[in-house]
């Protein structure tokens, strides 16, 4: 068999040009495999996309005047399922309109019952192995969704801001240390000031105490090698509950971890009364004013800072102390690293191996819990009488009335990471799983190499001791003609279905493949779509011309007599077989745009502009050349159309009907053309 699993589109809206590129490539691979006689299986489906979909549903509810917080979990999930049914259905219909020849009866959704059980089973198995644990740790926090998010869901933006220098008085002395910060509001949670142990300026102060301004808390001056004496003033305020580097220092020095923010990033009761309840940025302004009024503002500098934003919430994240579920990744990655290094799994283009290895070699424990409603609820129950008693299973405890389930859901990627086997009802042993797993090729974007690709490889080896796929093809990034990434938010991404109406679906498919070289970004251009449309017209006209000039005495299946062939005939047959050979070579290397160019060049230049012109004069003659020419045209067309079919399925299937002979099948299941090496003539080619 030849198997592909679709990277399931999120049920958050409509398909984009990126989806068109990705799914056209998959369709090319699956149609070719099917015509080669393989049992081709392409599993379609959609992803619940936890945080992305929940954000959309909340916005939809707000437009109706409904606040999420006024709904019960069950009521909110009803709205989310309605959203899924609407947009999931639209996406599937759009994939069909694109021409995707999926096994539609095998369609899956990452929250359908069987798949959900598989997701929860993966959690239980890893928990029982000691690879999943709950910890109170610093996480990336989105104040909009009020949830932890992963490093990969944080977008860093350069922001023009300020660097404020505050004077921190040393207790009992008429001296102070100057610390710099871009986030003054976090000073409310400071636990220490750190200096380098070898910094001669401050050695005498190590062990002394700071009177923390505005707060009145006494905090120590500590020595730590992390501090760079040449950066800034050489003094660093330490806020272990609100900064990852400070968190590590806090652990080393057993400092107090003081969280001064609520889940929405407003200031909490651990701060002085006047700041409680203020938004973090309002508190920042107030703190700067108060520091200045106390004569403790040393100076302010303009500063360009890289700030992490929540990808979905589009607000600056906070580093936030929170109880979360984590997965120990170091214990899982070795087989996945070895598989790619050994070539058991191949990346196309190969340069992505370096990126993959770097991430895997520096992997951290994965925060897999999210404080959301839409998703797979974590299969952990706490006893109502004793919260330290846990029950972990897919179905829950028998006396469930005495237990309360964890309210958090799993990170979306902790469900889609089992996709290649979950779609075949893993962990149940079954014929489908044995037949179609491992899959052959994964087609995906390089932007989710960590989110998804690496994690699927990990699960394949962890749960089945098999690679989940043999080849990974990373698609190009689509950019506009100025080099900006195509994006709906930027307004530079056309609606693909408007383009289908304007140019035709086949023309868009062929045009986008012409402009998508392996390993390079794609400069999207409507001119290429024009080329695609003109090419479809050229092919259509050539086929119509040939079909209209069938000789009256033509016999179906008549072979070409080598002796009767003239030089132009031998030349076009040689060019045809060379084109088939080159096309197959490019396809085997995953060079889809080069394969498209081979077909374009042969059909437009050799066949249409050259041989068809000769055919025009021969078709109006009464000698044997008319029959020979028609036979050669038929042989060319009956090999051209199958080669072109994976790229342009609609027009080729229609044209195939013009030239069908007895016992012919539909083009989609017709045999793949075979190269006749003996027909390739180096001398005349």
Predicted feature residues:
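Conserved short loop/turn motifs at secondary-structure junctions
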Residues: 18, 45-48, 76-81, 105-116, ...
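N-terminal, positively charged nucleic-acid-binding surface of large information/translation enzymes
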Residues: 1-198, 239-252, 256-271, 280, ...
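Active-site-adjacent "gating/activation" loops or surface patches in catalytic cores
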Residues: 217-222, 407-437, 605, 609-612
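Conserved phosphate-binding loops in nucleotide/dinucleotide-binding enzymes
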Residues: 157, 238-241, 281, 318, ...
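Gly/Pro-rich turn-and-neighbor structural signature
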Residues: 114-147, 153-155, 167-171, 359-413, ...
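Active-site and channel-lining beta-strand-loop segments
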Residues: 257-264, 307-310, 379-382, 469-491
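Catalytic adenosine-cofactor/nucleotide-binding cores of aminoacyl-tRNA synthetases and other
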Residues: 309-313, 477-482, 486-565, 661-663, ...
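Acidic, turn-prone loop/beta-hairpin segments
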Residues: 47, 143, 150-155, 382, ...
């Amino acid at each position: 068999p030849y198997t592909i699993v679709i990277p399931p589109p999120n049920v958050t809206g409509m398909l984009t040009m990126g989806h068109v590129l990705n799914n056209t490539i998959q369709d090319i691979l699956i149609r070719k495999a099917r015509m080669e006689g393989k049992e081709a299986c392409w599993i379609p489906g959609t992803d619940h996309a936890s945080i992305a979909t929940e954000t959309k549903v909340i916005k939809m509810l707000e437009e109706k005047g409904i606040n999420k917080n006024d709904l019960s979990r069950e009521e909110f999930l009803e709205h989310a399922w309605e959203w899924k049914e609407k947009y999931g259905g639209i996406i599937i219909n759009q994939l069909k309109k694109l021409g995707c020849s999926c096994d539609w009866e095998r369609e899956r959704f990452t929250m359908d019952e069987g798949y959900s059980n598989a997701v929860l089973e993966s959690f239980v198995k890893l928990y029982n192995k000691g690879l999943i644990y709950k910890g109170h740790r610093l996480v990336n926090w989105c104040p909009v969704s009020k949830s932890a998010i992963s490093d990969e869901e944080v977008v860093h933006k350069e922001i023009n801001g300020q660097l404020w220098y505050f004077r921190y008085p040393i207790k009992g002395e008429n001296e102070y240390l100057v610390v710099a910060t871009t986030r003054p509001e976090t000073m409310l949670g400071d636990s220490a000031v750190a200096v380098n142990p070898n910094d001669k300026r401050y050695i005498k102060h190590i062990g002394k105490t700071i009177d923390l301004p505005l707060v009145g808390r006494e905090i120590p001056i500590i020595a730590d090698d992390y501090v760079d004496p040449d950066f800034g003033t050489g003094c660093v305020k330490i806020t272990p509950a609100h900064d990852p580097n400070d968190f590590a220092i806090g652990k080393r020095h057993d400092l107090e971890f003081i969280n001064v923010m609520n889940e929405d990033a407003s200031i909490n009761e651990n701060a002085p009364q006047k700041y409680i309840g203020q938004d973090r940025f309002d508190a920042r302004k107030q703190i700067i004013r108060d520091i200045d009024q106390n004569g403790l503002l040393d100076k302010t500098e303009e500063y360009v800072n890289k700030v992490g934003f929540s990808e979905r919430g589009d607000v600056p994240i906070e580093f936030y102390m929170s109880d979360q579920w984590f997965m120990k990744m170091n214990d899982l990655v070795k087989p996945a690293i070895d598989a790619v290094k050994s070539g058991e799994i191949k990346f196309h283009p190969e340069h992505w191996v370096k990126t993959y290895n770097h991430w895997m070699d520096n992997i951290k424990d994965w925060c897999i819990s999210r404080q959301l409603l839409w998703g797979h609820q974590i299969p952990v129950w706490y006893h109502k009488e004793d919260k330290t008693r846990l029950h972990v299973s897919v179905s829950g405890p028998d006396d469930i009335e005495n237990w309360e389930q964890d309210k958090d859901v799993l990170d979306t990627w902790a469900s889609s990471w089992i996709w290649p086997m979950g779609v075949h009802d893993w962990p149940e042993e079954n014929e489908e799983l044995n037949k179609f797993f491992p899959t052959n090729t994964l087609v995906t974007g390089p932007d989710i190499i960590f989110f998804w690709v690496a994690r699927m490889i990990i699960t394949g080896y962890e749960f089945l001791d098999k690679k989940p796929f043999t080849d990974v093809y990373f698609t190009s990034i689509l950019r506009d003609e100025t080099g900006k990434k195509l994006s709906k938010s930027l307004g530079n991404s056309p609606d693909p279905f408007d383009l289908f109406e304007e140019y035709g679906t086949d023309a868009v498919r062929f045009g986008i493949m012409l402009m998508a070289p392996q390993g390079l970004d794609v400069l999207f251009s409507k001119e290429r779509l024009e080329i695609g449309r003109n090419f479809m017209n050229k092919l259509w006209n050539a086929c119509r011309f040939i079909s209209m000039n069938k000789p009256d005495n033509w016999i179906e299946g008549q072979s070409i007599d080598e002796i009767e062939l003239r030089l132009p005939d031998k030349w076009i047959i040689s060019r045809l077989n060379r084109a088939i050979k080159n096309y197959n070579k490019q396809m085997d290397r995953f060079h889809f745009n080069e394969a498209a160019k081979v077909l374009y060049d042969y059909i437009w230049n050799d066949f249409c502009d050259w041989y068809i012109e000769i055919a025009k004069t021969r078709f109006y003659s009464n000698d044997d050349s008319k029959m020979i020419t028609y036979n050669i045209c038929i042989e060319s067309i009956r090999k051209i159309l199958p080669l072109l079919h994976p790229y342009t399925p609609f027009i080729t299937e229609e044209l195939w009907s013009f030239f069908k002979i007895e016992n012919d099948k539909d083009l989609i299941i017709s045999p793949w053309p075979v190269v006749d090496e003996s027909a390739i003539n180096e001398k005349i080619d």
